[in-house]
Amino acid sequence: QAAVGTTWTWTAPATDYTGYLVDVYRTKENGTEVILGTIAVDVSSDWTRFPRYGFVATFDASKKVDGVIEKEMAFLNRCHINGVQFQDWHNKHHWPLGGTREHLDEVYKDIANREVYTEVVKKYISTQHSLGMKSMFYNLCFGALDDAVSDGVKEEWYIFKNTGRMDKDSHDLPSSWKSNIFLLNPTNTEWQAYIAQRNDDVYANLDFDGYQIDQLGNRGDRYDYDGNKVNLPKGYASFIEAMKQKHPDKRLVMNAVSSYGASQIAGTGKVDFLYNEVWGDEAGFKDLHTIIKANDQYGNHALKTVFAAYMNYDKAGSSTGEFNTPGVLLTDAVIFALGGSHLELGDHMLCREYFPSTALQMNDVLKTAMIRYYDFMTAYQNLLRDKDTEAEISVSLNCTDAARNLSLNA
């Protein structure tokens, strides 16, 4: 189709959930085509059919500067990111909104005592919506800070490390942070009603599209207030059901940390795709294939998989610098070829489970490669990620012993 001037208009075919690759080229006098550029197009009525998930994690005064948010989101848009997770945006885990339903705080502190500006959160949401992205707020399914009793959280809702009610289960944090996080029973219906109402306060004031639910993996034996052993995976399913019942029009995604509770999460039929945070015991490329195959069964062949796989994790924990470009690209090539997606792009590139960490940066080569890789994943999504497109082939590689042990931390 010929373009006139510097613009080009195209009406997509009516077929839903289809990826396309657009080539922009000119033809020389001898008939040779010269490619000027390429870009992918995703024609889908629902973003969760082929989720390409990003994140934002800093909401301080630096984001109020004109053009900062727009530039960040323009890059995500160019990479076809269609959903964005808001990490560490909340005031308290048991009271996520900064302020009250009736009166929002202009600025409040997150769990690490960083400043969060409500206007920045709102601007991220509105900018994402203007680009066709969806905005998902993050929170644990069972977290409360040390002042929770003053906000109406009851002692009977917690889980404990023993049957004596003396030692609440907790996720301990640095002393400079706001509080440790104390864990509640996700099955407890009173807690479910409480946090669902807090979420209602959020939705009433901030135009989020859904809830990115988190957990903390296998905690070992834990007990409720009455001394009964708690079945956390069953509790996660119950929690998801309760959140969907309270807000049926909002999207839900839940993290399966090291695949813990994955089958129960998927089995609810209430999450929109599957999300796996992978750790050292499942950080090989073969493990990713195993997870995707399992998720496909858990989700009845209907739910896609997004991996939270932190690149150059060890390096980011001990130094600063740049990402290992070949390692990132090889990992993405594997994940995309397996039919998954990689949570990695946001207001920076992700390297640690603490999303605000900016220890490592993308160089220009990696930034350019990200655009090309995400173009490819989007354009060929029907081959890579659609139903019944898996093919088994035999591959033989000659490589060094070191290369045989490639992992996500490459």
Task: Go through each PLM region and give its residues.
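Short, acidic/polar
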Residues: A61-R78, W191-N205, V257-I265, N324-D332
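Aromatic- and acidic-residue-enriched carbohydrate-binding clefts of CAZyme catalytic domains
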Residues: H90-V121, V149-N188, G217-K234
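Active-site neighborhood of glycoside hydrolase catalytic domains
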Residues: L184-L303
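Active-site-proximal substrate-binding groove within the catalytic cores of carbohydrate-active enzymes
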Residues: M254, T268-K270, G284-A410
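Beta-strand-enriched, solvent-exposed domains that form extended recognition/catalytic surfaces
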Residues: Q1-D46
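Hydrophobic faces of well-ordered beta-strands that scaffold small-molecule active sites
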Residues: R52-F55, V84-F86, S135-Y138, Y211-I213, ...
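An acidic-aromatic substrate-binding cleft motif
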Residues: V34-K92
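Active-site-adjacent "subsite" loops/lids of carbohydrate-active enzymes
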Residues: S45-D66, S135-L206
